[in-house]
């Protein structure tokens, strides 16, 4: 039995280009299906793709054909039923099927076209047109990254980067240049030898001299090396500076006793979606997790999402801790600072004005964007209205939205992080 081993880099995805073209063509259908899937799934259930269905009528290719009206003169093969000049009734129009009623044995149609998109494609459509607002490049000394780019051909380089086509082309050109005169003389001598053998077969001396000359020319041509170090050509790769934007996202989650388990679950889902978005779209970004009730603590990812600690409610404790961490580790001159806060809006009454004061004086002047989501089906409380006053002063860098159920998470998330036009 014979085995064929496919060593091509893209062997198992030979139609990758066609698939990408298909995804671009039906982007609207796929995007709508992804949005429906996100609202249907749990936010944590993002480990697989999605089955997409496109109506058959939407994948039909446009074709040119004759219209159904008008008169036509057609010559048909001879038959026993009709003679010259007879008129044939026009067939009744209609679709392929027989319409309502009993099943028939004729007619045809097309089912919906279904296909599977991968997890990577699913996330690409899920986070399409989303970005961190106001992201700018900071002047960072010594923190530039580099990317390797093609920069033409070089005569020196690493053997692993040899350009075979350019090398063989150079070798061929060199051999032609060095042996060109010898090949021309060899051609002339060969023609002369054939003429003498044909017209002067008895002139052994001249014939022998020509044969010796031909052998000498062939030897000279063979001495030209097939490949020389001069011929070697390498793909030149250079490092190009790639200034990076350093960013940090502060995640502030209320875990006080007023937050029911359902409310906490919605908050966690919102932050899971945010964390997934950040890690997929940005290579260099720090995420600081802060949980708070009457006091605030910086925690790791595991504790942020799964700790069961609870208590009273003093929102300003989280804002004070965020300001301290900013001053200690993330100066605004070097970092793009973002924050996302989730709460049910329930706060100690005297603390809400303090939150507005801390945000207005110590946080908002130094951040690129601050988002607040309030998870409650009830009327807003004092904290929401204090934050509304902040939004009036910082319309471009502050946003607040309300979440009522888990189905609101994705639409609100897109609203908060929708890509904006730069004027």
From Swiss-Prot:
Belongs to the UPF0229 family. Pfam families: DUF444. Residues 92-107 have a biased composition (Gly residues). Residues 65-110 are annotated as: Disordered. This is UPF0229 protein PSPPH_0628. InterPro entries: UPF0229 (IPR006698), vWFA_dom_sf (IPR036465). SUPFAM superfamilies: vWA-like. Disulfide bonds: none annotated.
